[in-house]
Amino acid sequence: MKENGDSVSGQDELCDLTIIGGGPTGIFAAFQCGMNNISCRIIESMPELGGQLTALYPEKHIYDVAAFPEVQASELVESLWGQAKRYDPEVVLDEQVRQYKKLDDGSFEVETLSGRTFASRALLVAAGLGAFSPRKLPQLGDISELEGHTVLYSVQNMKELEGKKVLIVGGGDSALDWAMMLLPHAEHITVAHRSPDFRAHGKTKDDLFAAAEKGLVDVHLNTEVIAIDHDGPALRHAYLRSKSGKETSLEAEYMLVLIGFKSDLGPLAEWGLELCENAMVVDSQMKTEVDGLYAAGDIAYYPGKLKIIQTGLSDATMAVRHCLNYIHPGEKIKQQFSSIKMAKEKNK
């Protein structure tokens, strides 16, 4: 398999586990398959592995993954793939799974929107939030001319914001994280949020307000963007209005609209599985109500679930570990310790 996998072609042979989704959870599940000596296949709807980390914020810095005090999203994907690729998992890109079928012998067959079929002994859904699209600002009307140019819903290249006047719209972790990351690079940062308080982590809020006190960033709470001026795809000004009626005009060369995404499970929602909070309900073994069909990461629901990368990695480990009992019924499953397994592999 080639790095960031080239799509395979033709009808594929039966493998032990098909993993639907090639984000962090899916990639780590592939590593866990290798650790447990079972074959796997990742089917990813995007042209690259990495899920949201690759598609939405490859340059964002992440701080809450164990052993990484700070890591860029794209680098985390590379590290995860570096772990998994030693076991040569099959990777199928640009294919969205449409439906599954459980066969009489207990194995599974999935079919993609293009009509390709893949067979495996068990199935793991690690498709994140499903298909996602950014939430926009409907009050601005049709701004498609600016989208992807000076109105952005994710940051693909931080260098284009170097020395620019940037307006960030939003109040969650993503909005405030980008505000803090861009402070050393942008000419000026303005953050506008329609609510009276931010929804981000406490420390991030404290850091932003501290920067505001130093005059490094302007913060507007209870405020919405009501209009913009532009020259073709070039943004010139933005106009803000607070809930008290105060209006503010500011120069802005870029506007980052970071107010979240609308998720859609797409065909997965039609599988007839129990759903809660737009996710598949699983038990303590990450199994759905269908024996042999597991879910992990953001698409898996259980009481107390946290939708963060770290939890997804744990989910993947649990799902693969317990699917062994389905793939190899009646066999005693031994606990694999990575240090021992890697030492044996190096001595081969």
From Swiss-Prot:
Documented EC number(s): 1.18.1.2
Cofactor: FAD
EC top class, as a word: oxidoreductase
Pfam families: Pyr_redox_2 (PF07992)
Top-level taxonomic group: Bacteria
Subunit relationships: Homodimer.
HAMAP family in the cross-refs: FENR2 (MF_01685)
The protein, known as: Ferredoxin--NADP reductase
